[in-house]
């Protein structure tokens, strides 16, 4: 047969403790070792999710390791982490962009919305630290009363 190597970086694992733990792809340490300064780490805390607040399950964190706009790993500690990691497994398996995850529409209010918000958090610093955006905002502020 032909030599082949199975791709396994998109296979998630979960530990059903309290809180649940889940991981797919590279951990932060592995991503930092492989990608160095190209790595961005995005964090989103459950305490900013309305469903988590309503259910009093606000202890939790999702962390996504991103290189050049694409996730290379995700770690989740919190309520339903084993369910939430599925989206990131799909993202890694299909090499999806963070913009595609951020553009997804989730029912409101759901815990699953933390995935979308984590993806959206990737763009915050990019947008507000951009010199181009700063120049445009400065121009608009001078023109508008």
Listing of model-derived features with the role each one plays in the protein:
Residues 4, 11, 16-27, 32-145:
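Flexible, glycine-rich terminal cap/loop adjacent to redox cofactors
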């Amino acid at each position: 047969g032909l030599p082949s190597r199975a791709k396994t970086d998109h296979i998630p694992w979960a530990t059903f403790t309290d809180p649940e733990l889940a991981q797919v792809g590279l951990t932060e340490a592995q991503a930092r070792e492989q990608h160095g300064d190209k790595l961005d780490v995005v964090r989103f805390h459950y305490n900013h999710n309305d469903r988590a607040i309503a259910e009093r399950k606000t202890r939790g964190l999702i962390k996504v390791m991103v290189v050049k706009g694409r996730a290379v790993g995700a770690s989740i500690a919190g309520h339903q982490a084993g369910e939430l990691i599925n989206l990131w497994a799909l993202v890694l398996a299909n090499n999806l962009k963070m913009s595609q995850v951020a553009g997804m529409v989730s029912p409101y209010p759901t815990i699953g919305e933390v995935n979308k918000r984590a993806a959206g958090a990737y763009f915050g610093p990019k947008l507000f630290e951009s010199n181009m955006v700063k120049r445009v905002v400065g121009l608009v502020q001078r023109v508008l009363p």
